[in-house]
Amino acid sequence: MEFVTETLGKRIHDPYVEETRCLMIPGPIIVGSGPSGLATAACLKSRDIPSLILERSTCIASLWQHKTYDRLRLHLPKDFCELPLMPFPSSYPTYPTKQQFVQYLESYAEHFDLKPVFNQTVEEAKFDRRCGLWRVRTTGGKKDETMEYVSRWLVVATGENAEEVMPEIDGIPDFGGPILHTSSYKSGEIFSEKKILVVGCGNSGMEVCLDLCNFNALPSLVVRDSVHVLPQEMLGISTFGISTSLLKWFPVHVVDRFLLRMSRLVLGDTDRLGLVRPKLGPLERKIKCGKTPVLDVGTLAKIRSGHIKVYPELKRVMHYSAEFVDGRVDNFDAIILATGYKSNVPMWLKGVNMFSEKDGFPHKPFPNGWKGESGLYAVGFTKLGLLGAAIDAKKIAEDIEVQRHFLPLARPQHC
């Protein structure tokens, strides 16, 4: 490490470094303190490997704490959502609430003594081939200062949901009512007796419509593409659990056939409700296209009863109305965009080919997308939710432990 220290020391005369505080980190740098980042740090900690977690927000799991609606629960049973090395409390229900999940994450961080550095926005991260180290430049802190953190390893844990997707819709600037993304939606209370257009029919869009109904609003759902809707449970067992068990014994297309037949028995023909099923089965579509099936928590019953209207693709928006591709026009008081999130990795990770510039996901799909070159790792990009993040977090910690036997960890130092 003497060569590394010497190389870094020479950079003190560079104009860029003169304005930047620089700190050498002995263990990995983890960008993001959501469940993926916390899981990776905990797995490293269990192997006596320190890490530094950088977080742009003011708290852990900021998406869960600040950008989710009040009625949210985990859509999968808690057994499939726990992070490594620490189960959920036995007192928690099968499907924990948002508040319970946040409390679990806070307890997890406390248990493993994980202390992220908050208010640190990563502006750029790149590999310095001269010294074989990662340089991560951030801005933030109390004085909004620029910092550079240096390490042999970089773990990208910003995940699939770093930035809101804001669709381009003709006429949106002309709409007279409020327009908000689901990241700003908390409950339907303020929309009581109002006609609301919800754009997007994923799990969030479907559940927001249900929440609006519960507050006596009048929601309409825009369904642009085909979608698989499955019951949350079949025969008293979670649909996800059944799928996982069956996949151990049967190929995907056989399990898909079973899921579709059971869904028709439980939910009926969703095509008649305007929710046309894709040609690919739900699991095959998830694997090939990354499209997650919707787990129904009561929305279909509201659609059948007429409390939720279903419209096809949105053509354009006018002052207080919207026109759809089938020619229908209806009036609305507000628009809620349930259009999801996207990765922001290409915005700040430079000079690597591990991630796609198009969607910000690793080029290699699960289970091979967790490891790149030169000490670069990714966690939380499996499209398998918390379960996938836990799997990759364990692999990353194991891999770094092997490497540290060949080159001991450095001591923290200014560079």
Curated annotation (Swiss-Prot):
The gene is YUC2. It comes from Arabidopsis thaliana (Mouse-ear cress). Keywords: Auxin biosynthesis, FAD, Flavoprotein, Monooxygenase, NADP, Oxidoreductase. Its cofactor is FAD. One of its GO terms (molecular function) is NADP binding. This is Indole-3-pyruvate monooxygenase YUCCA2. Pfam families: FMO-like. It catalyses: indole-3-pyruvate + NADPH + O2 + H(+) = (indol-3-yl)acetate + CO2 + NADP(+) + H2O. Pathway: Plant hormone metabolism; auxin biosynthesis. NADP(+) binds at G200, C201, G202, N203, S204, G205. Expressed in anthers and in the apical gynoecium. Its EC number is 1.14.13.168. Disruption phenotype: No visible phenotype, due to the redundancy with the other members of the YUCCA family. Involved in auxin biosynthesis. Converts the indole-3-pyruvic acid (IPA) produced by the TAA family to indole-3-acetic acid (IAA). Unable to use tryptamine (TAM) as substrate. Required for the formation of floral organs and vascular tissues. Belongs to the set of redundant YUCCA genes probably responsible for auxin biosynthesis in shoots. GO terms for biological process: auxin biosynthetic process; response to ethylene.
